[in-house]
Amino acid sequence: MATDRRVSRVSSLIKREVSQMLLHGIKDDRVGAGMVSITDVDVSGDLQHAKIFVSIYGTEQAKAETMEGLKSSVGFVRRELGQRIRLRRTPEVVFLEDTSLERGDRTLHLLNQLQDARKEEDEYIEPAQDD
């Protein structure tokens, strides 16, 4: 079992290398359908599995195409990682769509709506109390 520090270091190395692959290495046109960024890499404690979370900006169709392209390029990504990073065994790679940014944006939007509604309610109540 690797230490937390080593897992963190391997995670950041994988994030950096896969980001470079997205820019220059992966030739699948589907990956370019949406703007892709890696938000997080979760490596298991034994360094055997890596979950790569990606955020995709674009239409729902572009997101679906991009995820298909990423899933089909898993073998290429794993092989490249094995060549670029010195590890005893290259981790199995899985791409997962990270929707936390969208959820956060939606939450902020709902909070802003709630705040605006309270302001309107306060403005409506205050003149009635002055009479």
From Swiss-Prot:
Answer whether the UniProt record assigns the keyword Transferase to this protein. no
Domain of life, per lineage = Bacteria
Checking Pfam families in the record gives: RBFA
InterPro entries to which the protein is assigned, alphabetical: KH_dom-like_a/b, RbfA, RbfA_dom_sf, Ribosome-bd_factorA_CS
Q: Name one GO biological process term.
A: maturation of SSU-rRNA
**Subcellular location field:** Cytoplasm
Q: List the disulfide bonds.
A: none
Molecular function, one GO term = ribosomal small subunit binding
Q: Which UniProt keywords apply?
A: Cytoplasm, Ribosome biogenesis
Its main localization is cytoplasm
One Gene Ontology CC term in the entry: cytosol
State the oligomer form and interacting partners.
Answer: Monomer. Binds 30S ribosomal subunits, but not 50S ribosomal subunits or 70S ribosomes.
| Family according to the record | Belongs to the RbfA family.
Briefly, what is this protein's role? One of several proteins that assist in the late maturation steps of the functional core of the 30S ribosomal subunit. Associates with free 30S ribosomal subunits (but not with 30S subunits that are part of 70S ribosomes or polysomes). Required for efficient processing of 16S rRNA. May interact with the 5'-terminal helix region of 16S rRNA.
**Can you say what this protein is called?**
Ribosome-binding factor A
The organism of origin for this protein = Gloeothece citriformis (strain PCC 7424)
This protein's encoding gene = rbfA
